[in-house]
Amino acid sequence: MPKLQLRSLASQDKIEEIFERFKPHAVIHTASPSYMDTKKTLMSKNVDGTKALLEAARTCSDTKAFVFTSSDEAIMPTQEPTSEENAHRYDENNAPNAPNTYALSKALAKRLVIAANSEELYTSVIRIPGIYGKYDDNFIPQLVSSMREKEHKMQVGNNTKVFEFLYVNKAAEAHIMAMKALLNPSTRDQVGGEDFFISDGKPQGLFDFCRRIYAAAGSPVRPEEVTSIPLSVMQTMASTMEWVYWVFTLGTVQPSLRRISMDHLDTGCCWSLDKARRILGYEPVQDQDKVIERTMDWTMKTF
C-alpha cells in the first residue's frame, strides 16, 4: 500500500509528480487552510490549489473522478430547509457579500470543480457543515477546554439561529458514495457536475448542540444556569482586540478572539438532504445522541 505523500497545493510540479507516480483512479480533495488564515494563503491554496489538482487530474488518463469538499460558509445563510438548487452561492459577482475570504475561496473553488466536469473527468462537490467525531482536534477539544475552564455555562447571543452538524463517519461515507457513483458508468451522469448537501439532518442552535456535548462529557448545563452575553458586545470586543494586536504586532500575531468567529454565530444553515438521499443513497445518523456519546468517550480519554 502506498505511503502517505505530503505535497504543497501551491506546487504544480509536485502535484503532477504524485499523479504520474500513483495514477489514481479518483481524487477526494478535502485539503484547506484554516478559515482564520490570511487572504493570500486562502486564495492560493483553496482556489489556485484546486485549479492545479483539477489540471493534474484532467491530464492523467487514469483519473476519472474528482470529489471536492465544500463548506456551509460558501453559501448564504438560511433558516429554512434549503435545497442545492435554491441555495444562494457566493461568487465573483457578489464577492463583497461573502462573510470572509474563506467562504469566498471555497465558493470559487467549488465553481472550478463543477465547471471541470466532463466525459474525461467526472466531478462532484460534497458540501458539509461543522464536523464532530473521533480524532477531531479542533471543535470538540475547544468545548472540552471551555468545560475545564468553567466557561461552558456561557453563551453568546440568543441562540435562535439553527446550524447543521455532521458526524465525521458520515462525512467520509458521503465522499466515498460520490466517488463510487462518479466511477460507475450507470450513475456518473447523475452525479457528475452536481453538489450535495450532507449533514446529520438535525438543525439546532449552536449552543444547544454544545450543551449536548457537555452533557455527554459529564458536565450537563441546566437552562437556568446559562449566562448570555449579547452578540454585539462580543463582536465589538473581537474587533477591538484585532485592532490592538494589529497596532502592536503589525499583524504578525492574531488574538484568540476573532471577529470572524463572532460573526459566524449570526449566520446558521438549514438544509434539505433529499438530493443526497435520492441520488447518492445517503442516510444521516439515526441516533445523534449515541454518536455524540461515542465521540466524547474517545475525546475525554484523549484530551
Curated annotation (Swiss-Prot):
It comes from the Eukaryota. One of its GO terms (cellular component) is endoplasmic reticulum membrane. Residues 77-96 are annotated as: Disordered. One of its GO terms (molecular function) is oxidoreductase activity, acting on the CH-OH group of donors, NAD or NADP as acceptor. InterPro entries: 3Beta_OHSteriod_DH/Estase, NAD(P)-bd_dom_sf. The active site is at K106 (proton donor). This is Sterol-4-alpha-carboxylate 3-dehydrogenase ERG26, decarboxylating. One of its GO terms (biological process) is sterol biosynthetic process. Sterol-4-alpha-carboxylate 3-dehydrogenase; part of the third module of ergosterol biosynthesis pathway that includes the late steps of the pathway. The third module or late pathway involves the ergosterol synthesis itself through consecutive reactions that mainly occur in the endoplasmic reticulum (ER) membrane. Substrate binds at S71, Y102. NADP(+) binds at S8, L9, T30, A31, S32, Y102, K106, I128, P129, G130, I131. Heterotetramer of ERG25, ERG26, ERG27 and ERG28. ERG28 acts as a scaffold to tether ERG27 and other 4,4-demethylation-related enzymes, forming a demethylation enzyme complex, in the endoplasmic reticulum. Its main location: endoplasmic reticulum. The lineage of its organism: Eukaryota, Fungi, Dikarya, Ascomycota, Pezizomycotina.
